[in-house]
Amino acid sequence: MALQGWLESLKAAQKTCILQDGRRKVHFLFTDGKEMAEEYDAKSHELIVRKWRQKSGLGAYGQWQIEVGDPPLPGAGTIQPDFLKESSSNPTFTRKDTKSSFQWRIRNLPYPKEVYSVTVDKKDRCCIIRTTNKKYYKKFSIPDLDRCHLDLNENAISFAHANNTLVVTYEKPKEILSIEEELQREVKSMKATTDGDVECKTQ
């Protein structure tokens, strides 16, 4: 069963934990060589960041791919002319979950709520945001459901719009809540170091 398989992968992964800047940072090294790093609020235990990376065929680590949390700023760490920088008025797509739902925020969308539609494509296993004025279109998957081979549910998705931000919410199925609860128990039981700015790593 895929659901049980993902849970077993989490349990079998090498894990290290560090408390830093009010966050519990957990690093997972899976048996296939992939790495996952998660950051939780140390008080509320809500997930703030989840990112992945894996080695290339040459053995070099690739860049971290953000799954949950704010993506790095365009051009962060590089110097580039102003005319090459991404406009701050462009829509930005960010996933920020709550304990009961997956949630995405698309900022810089000034159109009224009635312009938007959010649907589920079960065949392609993705959610689709459309606008009647053809100004915005976005397809995105829910990796958590893919990892557990869980079907998308049209009734679980909803959206709201305020302050130029579209908020799309997908209620977590009970299977995901069960896995997250079990993972939280394991994470909370881990001995966390508090050694300053040392990044969580598994040797």
UniProtKB/Swiss-Prot annotation:
Any single Pfam family the record assigns to this protein: DPCD
Regions crossing the membrane: none
Annotated InterPro entries: DPCD
Any coiled-coil regions, as ranges: none
Family: Belongs to the DPCD family.
Protein name according to UniProt: Protein DPCD
Gene: dpcd
